[in-house]
Amino acid sequence: MGKVKKEDIMDIVEKYDKSNITIATLGSHTALHILRGAKQEGFRTAVVCEKGKEVPYERFGVADEFIFVDEYKDIVNSDVQDKLRAMNAIVVPHGSFVAYAGLSNVEDKFNVPMFGNRDILRWEAERDKERKMITQSGIRMPRKFDKPEDINKEVMVKFPGARGGQGYFICSSYEEFQNKIQEMKERNWITDSDVKDAHIEEYVCGTNFCIHYFYSALKDEVEVLGMDSRYETNIDGIVRIPAQDQIEANLSPSYVVSGNHPVVIRESLLPQVFENGDRLVETAKKLVKPGMNGPFCLQCLVNDDREIVIFEMSARIDGGTNSFMNGSAYSYIQFGEVMSMGRRISREIKNAIETDKLDVILT
């Protein structure tokens, strides 16, 4: 639990002009459709941008206001916070916001109203907390290896924080683990601190889906808004090379996310999809109140037994939602109109303003 208290945030909200709310975010990650969705719902928008990185938000015309900073981490500076509060801002957090601002700063220093549950962000950042929440929900996860010396089969090695897969690798022995750790350190992709916190789990063979949910605290309902799969470099390039050439090229696979494409899942798997979302939401309410408020994502593999195995979660808007900026097959069925995740967030904020329930959705 951070130093920023909900009651202090609600004191700030109490002074806001509710008829002139601004939806704000950091200029990265999913900012385009967060801001576009806000404009679709009738809000003013603001983006906090590094100088020189404002081009997409200018060219696509999604931001009414620009707050320029030297570095993205400066969003927690007092002058930036003052500007945000002065424009009645509600900030929508995303992966880059947490990574650049720093989780402790978001918890302890960022005194601006945020959509969702700021306390839950640590539960996605720390692997043990993430695993606790998912397993206590009764959701299948890959087996965890407590130390690299225990590796006796194919495993995936991951590192903490929102890093888009950078530094992740597959290995099948302790010796191979050591060799690949050294290689990743030489590429400056990981540090000694990362190695200490390495998360080692069984490699599950299957098809990849990232399932994007929205939990409406106003309706107490879990929605499935869309799904995507990832383009990862350089693994997606390597698999295009014939096997013999792969061996001769001696390339080391990496799993850095470079893009996303929309997918739909086999319809008979949707009961599992909804059940996993419902279970996680109920567990989150118990572990970190008020729970999984707003968008969240479960990254999974579907094995040949048609079992959904969850290997990672995002407790805020996930980058894969960029794959359905104009709505997905699922959001269209749900709403009958174009509904991106960004617009869904602003729809919830608008409904909360109209029903005087901003305290239910902000922290």
UniProtKB/Swiss-Prot annotation:
<dbReference type="InterPro" id="IPR016185">
    <property type="entry name" value="PreATP-grasp_dom_sf"/>
</dbReference>
<keyword id="KW-0436">Ligase</keyword>
<comment type="function">
    <text>Catalyzes the ATP- and formate-dependent formylation of 5-aminoimidazole-4-carboxamide-1-beta-d-ribofuranosyl 5'-monophosphate (AICAR) to 5-formaminoimidazole-4-carboxamide-1-beta-d-ribofuranosyl 5'-monophosphate (FAICAR) in the absence of folates.</text>
</comment>
<feature type="binding site">
    <location>
        <position position="232"/>
    </location>
    <ligand>
        <name>ATP</name>
    </ligand>
</feature>
<feature type="binding site">
    <location>
        <position position="312"/>
    </location>
    <ligand>
        <name>Mg(2+)</name>
    </ligand>
</feature>
<feature type="binding site">
    <location>
        <position position="299"/>
    </location>
    <ligand>
        <name>Mg(2+)</name>
    </ligand>
</feature>
<dbReference type="InterPro" id="IPR011761">
    <property type="entry name" value="ATP-grasp"/>
</dbReference>
<feature type="domain" description="ATP-grasp">
    <location>
        <begin position="118"/>
        <end position="354"/>
    </location>
</feature>
<dbReference type="InterPro" id="IPR010672">
    <property type="entry name" value="IMP_biosynth_PurP_N"/>
</dbReference>
<dbReference type="Pfam" id="PF06849">
    <property type="entry name" value="DUF1246"/>
</dbReference>
<dbReference type="GO" id="GO:0005524">
    <property type="term" value="F:ATP binding"/>
</dbReference>
<feature type="binding site">
    <location>
        <position position="96"/>
    </location>
    <ligand>
        <name>5-amino-1-(5-phospho-beta-D-ribosyl)imidazole-4-carboxamide</name>
    </ligand>
</feature>
<keyword id="KW-0464">Manganese</keyword>
<comment type="similarity">
    <text>Belongs to the phosphohexose mutase family.</text>
</comment>
<dbReference type="GO" id="GO:0006189">
    <property type="term" value="P:'de novo' IMP biosynthetic process"/>
</dbReference>
<keyword id="KW-0067">ATP-binding</keyword>
<feature type="binding site">
    <location>
        <begin position="148"/>
        <end position="210"/>
    </location>
    <ligand>
        <name>ATP</name>
    </ligand>
</feature>
<keyword id="KW-0658">Purine biosynthesis</keyword>
<dbReference type="Pfam" id="PF06973">
    <property type="entry name" value="DUF1297"/>
</dbReference>
<dbReference type="InterPro" id="IPR023656">
    <property type="entry name" value="IMP_biosynth_PurP"/>
</dbReference>
<feature type="binding site">
    <location>
        <position position="29"/>
    </location>
    <ligand>
        <name>5-amino-1-(5-phospho-beta-D-ribosyl)imidazole-4-carboxamide</name>
    </ligand>
</feature>
<dbReference type="InterPro" id="IPR013815">
    <property type="entry name" value="ATP_grasp_subdomain_1"/>
</dbReference>
<keyword id="KW-0479">Metal-binding</keyword>
<keyword id="KW-0460">Magnesium</keyword>
<keyword id="KW-0547">Nucleotide-binding</keyword>
<dbReference type="GO" id="GO:0000287">
    <property type="term" value="F:magnesium ion binding"/>
</dbReference>
<comment type="pathway">
    <text>Purine metabolism; IMP biosynthesis via de novo pathway; 5-formamido-1-(5-phospho-D-ribosyl)imidazole-4-carboxamide from 5-amino-1-(5-phospho-D-ribosyl)imidazole-4-carboxamide (formate route): step 1/1.</text>
</comment>
<dbReference type="GO" id="GO:0016879">
    <property type="term" value="F:ligase activity, forming carbon-nitrogen bonds"/>
</dbReference>
<protein>
    <recommendedName>
        <fullName>5-formaminoimidazole-4-carboxamide-1-(beta)-D-ribofuranosyl 5'-monophosphate synthetase</fullName>
        <ecNumber>6.3.4.23</ecNumber>
    </recommendedName>
</protein>
<feature type="binding site">
    <location>
        <position position="260"/>
    </location>
    <ligand>
        <name>5-amino-1-(5-phospho-beta-D-ribosyl)imidazole-4-carboxamide</name>
    </ligand>
</feature>
<dbReference type="InterPro" id="IPR009720">
    <property type="entry name" value="IMP_biosynth_PurP_C"/>
</dbReference>
